[in-house]
Amino acid sequence: MNNNIMNLIAAIVLSLSIIFGWQYFVVKPEHKKQQQQIAMQKAENLKKQKLKALIKPASDLVVQEANQVQRIKIESESLTGSISLKGLRFDDLILKKYKQDLSKNSTEVRLFSPANTENAYFAEIGLVSNLSSVKLPNNDTIWNSDGEILSPEKPVNLFWVNEDGVKFLVTITLDENYLFTVEQTIVNNSDKELPVQSYGLINRKYIAVEKAVNILHQGPIGCINENLKEYSYDDIKDKKSEKFVASKVDWIGMTDKYWLSSLIPDKSSNYSSNFNYALTQGVERYQVDFISPVQIIKSGENFSITSRIFAGAKKVDLLDKYEKQYGIKLFDRAIDFGWFYIITKPVFYAMNFFYGYVGNFGISILIVTVIIKLLMFTLANKSYCSMKKMKNLQPEIDRIKNLYGDDKARLNQEIMALYKKEKVNPVAGCLPILVQIPVFFSIYKVLYVTIEMRQAPFYGWIKDLSAPDPTTIFNLFGFLPFSPPSFLMIGAWPILMAITMFLQQRMSPEPADPVQAQVMKFMPLIFLVMFSSFPVGLLIYWSWNNILSIIQQYYINKFN
């Protein structure tokens, strides 16, 4: 097949794939999300009128409960909040290192909120029994504590004794990041056998969840039987429940774009686990939970079991650390690196490595792009030489077409013989494009899903590499005092990317086919419009990649 035609097909397929992929996976879900939010808001307004007496802001409820029920204060460099001693519930948690947005008055990110608040989201670890006669701590139990503050330096010990003299002890420790360790001990001082089961749950109110787009997973997630399980909220709503019986549960939880809450049960046995949906009093709730097999504690014996709760930011190195330290399989997959995981995670590691030296992820992107370009130089050189040879062979190919145009078999045979004689690979020109596709999407994933890139600045007006360029040419990049609509937000970096793409085309061999040449001239304009809503970090990569390609082609032209 003619090399120019193949390049045209590859370029068009790549462009259309990105355009329609973006429309289908991002723009369309976002539009649907907006329509759903409008409808939900109307229903929510009616619902709030009915539930207004029941629902209070999280901060108000915490203050109210603090006056009625004692709470253990959580305080570390990473977290602040409290644990309710009524029912031993983790329901008040704020991430101190992260703000909601870049505004001066932005509040810190709240992860957990009490059960009857608007954004209810909480975790529990406790005990149940298959015998109703066994008196165990429950949601109404008021625990006694030996301390008022939980910190990395100060664990807390809780205790409660039932009417039969059975003693229940809980020790809670917190590391310097986001991991709580909960050790439960039962001292059976009664004269009866005590059947108990350990459980853990995470419960969340649906309206508090940001609607997910198809480019990443948000919702129930876990590693069960060494396989990653991911369910959208709609999946669980349709099924009502997804159950796993007597399974190896490494972890289960709920994930957002940047935040994760997960339960990590003791590894001493298998567990039954559930992903549930319930509609109660007009409020939609989702829950993930696990429960252990029945453990019989004989009279005079003790039993202990340890579980963990992770509640915080999905930092790559932190999840890797916990995965290695506690043997939590696939814990890093809570970050949705996508289909190109095998490429995406090394790309992140490379960016993070250079960030440690230069202190700016934008500069780190530039360095990684240079390395990728050097690794692909030989391939690009061969591709460029092949394209040039194909252009030089075009007159001979046209002559063969005129001779054997009616005999397709002979035509293909003669053209292939010409390629073999001149040592030309007709598909070589497509290889750099094919290789760049996974690299492109890997960098996009890194920018879009990793907490490290969230609100990471570059220079000048770029304050967040994971967000689109905030400027637009239609108000002269902010010099005119008005804000154009979103579809006119074509900023400086998209324009720079289009200019460098145009210059790169001028440096490349011009296609012999005039139709193809005309189509290729419009590609920078197409990419300009399409890329304007992409994360600016991706535009920095693409612009810099184009500049390096121009330098590379100049070098090849000069020495080849």
UniProtKB/Swiss-Prot annotation:
Keyword Membrane: yes
GO biological process, one term: protein transport
This protein's UniProt keywords: Cell inner membrane, Cell membrane, Chaperone, Membrane, Protein transport, Transmembrane, Transmembrane helix, Transport
GO molecular function: membrane insertase activity
Domain of life assignment: Bacteria
InterPro entries in UniProt: Membr_insert_YidC, Membr_insert_YidC_N, YidC/ALB3/OXA1/COX18, YidC/Oxa/ALB_C, YidC_ALB_C, YidC_periplasmic_sf
Gene3D superfamilies xrefs: 2.70.98.90
Transmembrane regions: 7-27, 334-354, 357-377, 431-451, 476-496, 522-542
GO cellular component: a single term: plasma membrane
Membrane topology of the entry: Multi-pass membrane protein
Pfam hit, one: YidC_periplas
Subcellular location: Cell inner membrane
Tagged with keyword Cell membrane: yes
Record-stated family: Belongs to the OXA1/ALB3/YidC family. Type 1 subfamily.
Subunit structure: Interacts with the Sec translocase complex via SecD. Specifically interacts with transmembrane segments of nascent integral membrane proteins during membrane integration.
Entries under HAMAP family matching the protein: YidC_type1
Role description: Required for the insertion and/or proper folding and/or complex formation of integral membrane proteins into the membrane. Involved in integration of membrane proteins that insert both dependently and independently of the Sec translocase complex, as well as at least some lipoproteins. Aids folding of multispanning membrane proteins.
Protein name: Membrane protein insertase YidC
Protein species of origin: Rickettsia canadensis (strain McKiel)
This protein's encoding gene: yidC
